[in-house]
Amino acid sequence: MANFLQDVNCETVSEYDGPDASIPEGVWEGYVGHDHAALWRTWSYIYECCKKGTLVQFRGGKLVTFSMFDNPRFSNGAGIDAQKVLDLEDRARELQGYGPVNRRTDVMPVDRWTLNGPLLRYDKMVLEDVGGTGSNRTMVRAQLEALQDERDVPDCDFILNVRDYPLLRRDGTRPYPQVYGKGRRLPEPWARGGPHVPVVSMCSGPTYADIAVPTYECIAHAYTSSGRTLPAGGRFVKTPSADSLPAWRDRKALAVFRGSSTGAGTSTEDNQRLRALQISMSRPDLADVGITKWNLRPRKTERYDGYRIIEPWQFGRKSPYPAAAKPMTPEQIAGYKYVLCLWGHAPAFRLARDLSLGSVVLLPSRPPGQEGLDMWHSSVLKPWTHYIPVRGDLSDLEKRIEWCRDNDAECEKIAAAGMEASLNLLGWEGQLDRWMDVLRSVRLECCPGGYDMPPSPSLVSDSMCVRQMVSFPRYEDIPQPSSPMPVLPRCSGTLRGWGLAASLGWDLGDAAEVLNVKRSTAVLSKTVFNNLIYRTPHLRYTFGVAASDPESTAAVILSEKLKGAVTMRSWLEDSRAWARGRNVASVLCQVSQALLEAQAAAGTVFGDLSLDTILVVPNPLPEYIYHDGTGGSFGLKLMPGDKWAVVTYGDYTRARIRVLKGDGRKGHLAVVGPQPVYTKLSERKWHDICCLVSCILRTARTSKRPAARALAAAVARAAGVKRPDMDAEALEATPYEAREEPLTRFGPAEFINGLVREFKLEEGGWAWTEKNKNIEKVLRPWERGLPLYPVRLWLSGDRKEAMRACVSSVLKAAPPRPATAAGAHHTFQTYLRTVGADLDSFPEWAAAAAHLKRLWKSPGSLPAGSASLRAPSVPPPCHGPAWALPFGTRTPGEFPSWFDPSCLGDWTEAMGQGAPLDLENGPAKAGSDPVAVHSAWETASQLSFEEDGWTESEPRPVRREAHVRAKERH
């Protein structure tokens, strides 16, 4: 999903102090009073209802944002009859000598088909970049960058649309009435109305609010006709210089046209290009018309129901369609006196270039059955002055050509006037004038006083990341021991010990690897996931973090390297792996258990959980035991030849952290990682399950292994996915995106239960559940370890001496003594079960272990405390981020004076683990969604955030970590 909150510039839109301005068509009243909330409303409307657009922002006269967005999971909601359309497509392909469409592999689900006026697209090639509308955007961006250099541009926000059709209707109905029908209301919440920021498009019309601006073809004409060099990335026809054009007397007295068979109509009655071809074939003495490419995609006009293709055999019986004509260059077109500028799907964007050729332009009005649409220059050009008008059905075209022949001198004058207009009114300066008139009139009429913007959650998150990174412990380099690195079991204490060794500058050799990641990923690895290692062995450990540049969003981490690990995708590509259903189910259970812990602790959403972000590792433990989320325990049995799982973290990972207090400020709860724009969709416990199941379904569809689809279907059933949704998801071209109706609403716990049931793990003895056996009564190998022990052992080489040093250090520092039951459960395993477990295994340290246990209070002796935690009053959730709420509704009320964001993590982690908490009335009821709970608290925290209170007087230095230097030396 496009990251609106990452892209939007949150600087204030200043008061307008420029000159008066207006545009002939006027400014739509729905733009009046727009602000930051309107910016979100318009962006989300285009993204959800129209698929794609570009966010554009000017501040201080400079272009600060030009960000394209494209919804990969766009749902059209048009109710298209896919069977009929594909039958038409097959017929068109047959007429062209091709085979039918492969409906199983090449066709997207019908609600994913993309629309563009009368046309639709069913295939998977829908993410257009430079090869699609990307070059068109490149041209517009180049002109806007020139605009900032040559004119005084006011502060403004708008959405740019470079597709053929306008997108925003004045009456609150759907665009593309050919597809949706007239009067089809927009879905919620956009049906409620509210101000919008301007949408600027290549054309508009009386029923649309879009403001027409110079098209990419017009801009290409302006560049080349003024001697400027076309921007790189554009593939446009150049306007020839006036000196290279033939004299009027040397031109042929024929009307000329070359172009493809675009247009909404399918016959000579409603398609101007087909009608012109028919006239040319019957009257070659009047016109030279050729279709350079036969576009037979299904299309629709308002004249008839249902889609159609261009009717064959309209031009004779030799072939269904005439042979394609050879394209002509502008110089060749200029060899004719009369140029036909015909509609395609929309008005012809080539008009400015056609006028510049010195020929008289014959310009028809709209074709039958198509909407009335106008270009930005419609009010500038005058019929019989700059061009010769023709009826939309071309019924008077022959008479117009004959008139031109009879009035050659008059035609020459019109051609000269049109050429002058194209070079001046429609040239470079004329186009910049149009942009300035549009932007100034919008500011003057809609928001002359400007408007403030809330602080960007992304910028807040980035600043919090910097605070976290500079707070990580710093150590001076200590000479590395000459002895080899000890070999110790992988457990919480060992991993933390190697992290300490890395911070001392010691090279961990093959046990670690340097990775370049986003700064947010590095912070989460260190502050969230490292702290969960004692609870689950299925998260990858990070030994150290460094930032290469304080201004950069990148970071360098020293990550754990697991011997023999491969991605789950690589493992499944093995010819036998797809058939290992029981082990695959076991791996997915392990991943789900890691999700449970990460969601409870920090509301974690990995965002891109897939077969590529899961590592499978050889040599598992004989059994793995976890809490089941309801106070009991859940176990898995593995064989020596099986694989166990480790989850890695990608750039889409996000979680909530408690930001350090400083300068007397309270802690702050902030999202680290990509900011979710639809919190009601992506901030739920099932999102990562949807991502993973989607990846498995899409991978299995392309696998040649017979067992792949059967196993993928079983996994999907375990996740509660319905069969039609399985089939549709398998055909998707892009990774899973959050949506109103998710692929499944199963969270990790429900997914585990489904896997156990679907793969009969309990019946085979591979899994078991003990509802009455609290996890506190189970000693798990990965909970063990004293962090100082690996370092001391490496230094001394003697186990007893290393343990003695550890015990001495432990006894000097009293264990944590939490004040509440939730806090006790939060620290119980991190202290007592790690320290106590290792001390208990050595009889000589029994007295020390007993001493530590006496210092620690048991949960039963503590008050529930945080069970009375109540969230502040938060405004009703909006369709989108809290950032989009109007300023008048942004204050959620004061946080309780005792509120500490870290207690929320205590509370959710204690859920289901036997904690004596008031689960019914606490901040999160038993069995509720921990991700949503964290999201609600973060929203309240975000709305209470005061940017001034977190401004640093001096930037903190970010120094290069010793462990990174050591690894690079190695």
UniProtKB/Swiss-Prot annotation:
Matching Pfam families: Glyco_transf_90
This protein's UniProt keywords: Kinase, Transferase
Superkingdom of the source species: Viruses
Composition-biased stretches (Basic and acidic residues): 953-970
Gene Ontology molecular functions: kinase activity
Stored InterPro entries: CAP10, O-Glucosyltr/Glycosyltrsf_90
Record's protein name: Uncharacterized protein 027R
Source organism per UniProt: Frog virus 3 (isolate Goorha)
Lineage, broadest ranks: Viruses, Varidnaviria, Bamfordvirae, Nucleocytoviricota, Megaviricetes
